[in-house]
Each structure stands twice: as structure tokens, then as C-alpha cells.
Amino acid sequence: MRKITAPDLPATGLLDTHDRQREGVITERPPLAYPVALRALASCAATTARLLRQRRIHLPAGHVGTRLRFADGTSARVYRETVVDRGATKDPCVLVVEFRLRAVRGWGHAAFRWESLLNTPLFVGFPGFVSKLWLANDERGRYRGLYEWDGPRRAEDYARALWRVLALVSVPGSIHYTVLPGLRRDEVLARPPAMAGTAAADVPEWWRLTKVS
């Protein structure tokens, strides 16, 4: 597969083209403009409230404790899973997000893992959300989220909005995301090589899963 790149466009709004939804890795663009990101996050929070009332958000324990190893030599443990009841996923993709928190050391990581549940309204109500695996800090202090999304464009819209929130608490330059169209989360967990060969050689592979144990 070839790498999909985007033109140098200003971050003024949500994606308005289907050009970057073709087969291959969708690499990151700058975050959304603040007003656009805030509107998206507010809409997400409202949808999350409705999903909670309908009891459609769940925290299954099946993957908790699983260790995921990545192509950059790091690994991280799944400490939470979030899924939402929804219809069939028609255009699956995997989204991987990473960031490194500022000034968090030692017990601070445990505190973050506990309070991070309160961040659920920041993602579960976005259009196309299917599931999220929350990964603890790896050997380099980086956190990852491994998501399944319905629609690569929707996944990227979410990642670019989330960026604005993460930037408030993250080390500058540590926020990254990658979208992998055509893959399902359970597929890459069962067969990590499914992620291999999906990116050009010059794309850093912090996101590529190599082993699940």
C-alpha cells in the first residue's frame, strides 16, 4: 500500500474531500482550528450524555491487562476498554493516537489512569466511534489509544479535534496519530502483521503493532 499524504492546507475546518480515504495509511495533519474543535467537542459531549442515558457505553474487561508491543521496540499494557452499542461498521479503520504528558512521573501515571475515565465524553460521542483500548505509558512515557472507527475521515476529524485538548497537558511535539483504513481492531489484535506494509518506509512506526501477549 502507498502512503497517503495531504496538501498543505490551513487547519480551518473538518476534511471536505474523499481523496485521502483511499487504501493506505493516513498520516497526520495539523489540529483543527480552535472554534471548529470546540464545536466538535461540545457536540460529542452532548451525544455522550444521550448514550449514557441509553446505557449504550460499556467497559468490558476482556482485553484489560493485555500487553501490546510496537515496531519501535516499546510496549504498553491495556488498562481500560470502552465500547459503544451501535449498528454494523460499514467502513472500518484503526486509529492510533500517542502523546506524552508533561511533568507526570511515578505515581502520577497511576493517578492519570484513574482520572482518565472522566475524559470519556471527549471521544465516545464522536460520529463513527466503535471502540477504544486505553494503553498505559510505555518505556518512553508515551500513552497510546488504539481505536476502531467507522470511517477514516471521521477518525481523523476526531484526532484533529482531540489534539487541541491533549496539547493542554502534553509535551510539545509528542502528539501524533495514524489512521489505517480497511482494518478492524480485532483483526490487528489477532493478527498484528495485518498492519505491516501499510506505510511508506519514511513513516515512523510507533503505531505498528507487532505482538499481543
What label would you give each PLM region?
Residues 136-138, 179-183:
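A general secondary-structure junction signal
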Residues 123-126, 156, 169:
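Amphipathic alpha-helical interaction segments
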Residues 2-126, 181-213:
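Short S/T/G/P-rich N-terminal loop/turn motif that feeds into the first structured element of a domain
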Residues 167-181:
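Conserved short beta-strand edge segments in small beta-sheet-based binding/regulatory domains
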Residues 162-166:
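Short, non-transmembrane amphipathic alpha-helical segments
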